[in-house]
Amino acid sequence: AAAERPDDDSLRIYRMQEIEVTATRATEKTPVAFSNLSHDEIARNSYGFDIPSLLALTPSMIATNETGIGIGGTSIRLRGTDATRLNVTVNGVSMNNPDSHSVYWYDTPDLISSVGSVQVQRGAGISTNGTGAFGGAVNMTTAPIGTDFSGEASLSYGSYNTNKQAVRISSGLLGDHWV
């Protein structure tokens, strides 16, 4: 039987050009104090912590946690400035609430396992980071996706019976296309 032709009102497929996601990062020539956390540093230090607790590994960053275990209820300060004066981005997209300019870290409980690198800029920083970057900026980029099939599983256990289970599976390229 011959394949039926879809109706005129059915979904149409359009091929688009490649989209590249970029993020603004400070370099050695940029007149701003900054620190970078590589993927290896993040992987080595992220067990049992949320992102704000990991950020406390950088100079001038302080994290306080209401729960006492480093997960949830964590707030940050950079050079004494509260989090509402820090611009936080993932792949260049702001995570700050447009109303209060806070970042609700509760909404991203496992983002840390997808982060490839982090740059913390101390001070006003690069002006492209928006008006909220008065105190500084936290720029995160996600880890690159591989072209081959891959998988990863991890289990973590910590104080006060805290635990984390994570599974990541990547199809890679299928038929020379991303799925």
Give the label of every model feature segment:
Residues A2-R44, A83:
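Short, acidic, small-residue-rich periplasmic hinge/interaction motif at the N-terminus
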Residues F34-I51, I76-T81, Y157:
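Short, polar/charged loop or turn motifs at beta-strand boundaries
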Residues L54, R79, Q121, T141, ...:
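Transmembrane beta-barrel domains of outer membrane proteins
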Residues S94-R122, T141:
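Short acidic/polar hinge/loop motifs at secondary-structure boundaries
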